[in-house]
Amino acid sequence: MGMYTGLRFKGTVKEEFRDSFEDIAMHGRWAESDDYMFYAFGCDYRASFIPCGCLAYMPEEWEIESIDRKYAIDTDGFDRTYDKESGRWTFQCSLKNYDDTIEKFLNMVPYFVEDVEHAEVFYEEWDCSEKWELIDGKMVMTNDKFVNYTHSDLGFC
């Protein structure tokens, strides 16, 4: 059946991309973009799951559940939002990362994002998530024991 990997993201889209980025930010329409980099990423089978993949097998701390799953509330400000004026983009999602879709996304982030406030990756069988940061024009994994989701106190690993 396959395992899920989650991604939580908060960042600022570069000004030159802001006007045309809303369909991607809110609907995952990478392949419909006129920008070649976005289009090429959109050709990945699971690209639209970023940012639109619903959470599956992610830590309970990532959302407040509801009786009806579609009404669950994202926590910590990771609900899917995009502000065209400021470029602020937030989301959390999960997907089966068979083709390294998340890694492809992270590699592309420096192309269209000027600032990353939070980038976190969590594989459903891990105890701890990874923290990623934008450093010198590259996304770099800076902490492979970022948040421990196996303990009720939610401390660092």
Describe the role of every protein-language-model region:
Residues 1-35, 156:
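Short, extreme N-terminal segment that most often corresponds to the first beta-strand
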Residues 27, 36-40, 44-157:
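Charged interaction segments
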